[in-house]
Design a protein with these regions (language model features):
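Short, small-residue-biased leader/transition segments that mark boundaries at the very start
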Residues: 1-6
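C-terminal cap of metal-dependent C-N hydrolases
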Residues: 188-233
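Catalytic beta/alpha-barrel core
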Residues: 50-54, 72-81, 104-106
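Flexible, glycine/charged-enriched surface loops at secondary-structure junctions
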Residues: 17-35, 76, 184-185
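Hard-cation-handling environments
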Residues: 21, 31-38, 42-48, 54
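His/Asp/Glu-enriched, well-ordered alpha-helical/loop segment
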Residues: 48, 87-90, 94-198, 218
Length: 246
């Protein structure tokens, strides 16, 4: 309850600050506040809200708060219980960035189902906006496989989700949530040519990325050592030597 009061007070302050900053007479502007500047950007529609929530009741509460103060939530992240309010998310045009099959690591992350992504996606006759995400440095390198797992779970649950449709979960839907769908996220004339060419089915663990283009420029070529960026990221999770089991 105390947290709810704090959130509401922050938005009340932001509304007053925004009203003050809109005064034509700059002498009447309030003292500059960087935190309130950010909330003012949200109220003015200049900043997209990426809201971190696990539970359905928390997401519903944040939606009510956004309506009270007239701002838009673009996406909920982690959203383990998004399947419980999938229709509400679709009605409000809110995306949900979700893990394929990771949950149970803390109390608010207990109540998930493997078809979470598919249920959000298929809400309101398929108008939901689901995103398969990872905030893990290893998992992000296998995001196509994470999407494949979510697609398989959805189809096991009775949904008929094609590979082409599931590809949106890691392409156009994230671009939509980031506010850059007009620039990237799909292959269309006029958009940035951000493209990966695979050796086979992108959802197969046996497929490899053969070429990567970023804004139309070749950034990676599996057959050309000169176009293979060097990374200092070690694949896999390696414990420091002093922490390894002897």
């Amino acid at each position: 309850a105390a947290s709810d009061v704090y959130k509401r007070q922050a938005w009340i302050d932001a509304v007053e600050y925004t009203d003050g900053m809109s005064e034509t007479n700059e002498d009447r502007h309030p003292k500059r506040d960087l935190a309130l500047d950010t909330l003012m950007g949200v109220l003015n529609g200049e900043i997209l809200v990426q809201n971190h929530c696990y539970r359905a009741d928390e997401m519903a509460m944040m939606i009510e708060l956004s309506k009270e103060f007239d701002y838009k939530i673009t996406a909920f992240h982690h959203a383990v219980e998004a399947y419980k309010i999938a229709d509400l998310l679709a009605d409000e045009g809110i995306c949900a960035a979700l893990w394929a099959d990771w949950w149970g690591f803390k109390h608010e992350a207990y109540d998930m189902v493997q078809a979470n992504v598919a249920i959000v996606d298929q809400a309101r006759n398929g108008t939901g906006c689901a995103i398969v995400h990872s905030d893990d440095p290893v998992g992000i390198q296998h995001l196509n496989e994470e999407a494949a797992k979510a697609m398989a779970a959805g189809n096991r649950a009775g949904f008929n989700i094609s590979k082409a449709h599931a590809m949106r979960w890691i392409t156009s839907n994230p671009a939509k949530a980031a506010g850059i769908l007009d620039q990237t996220g799909s292959i269309e004339v006029g958009k940035d040519a951000d493209i990966v060419l695979w050796s086979g089915n992108p959802f197969s663990v046996y497929s490899r990325a053969e070429k990567v283009l970023i804004d139309g420029a070749l950034a990676f070529d599996i057959n050309d050592p000169k176009i293979q960026p060097i990374t200092d990221f070690d694949l896999g999770i390696i414990q420091p030597e002093e922490n390894r089991v002897q």
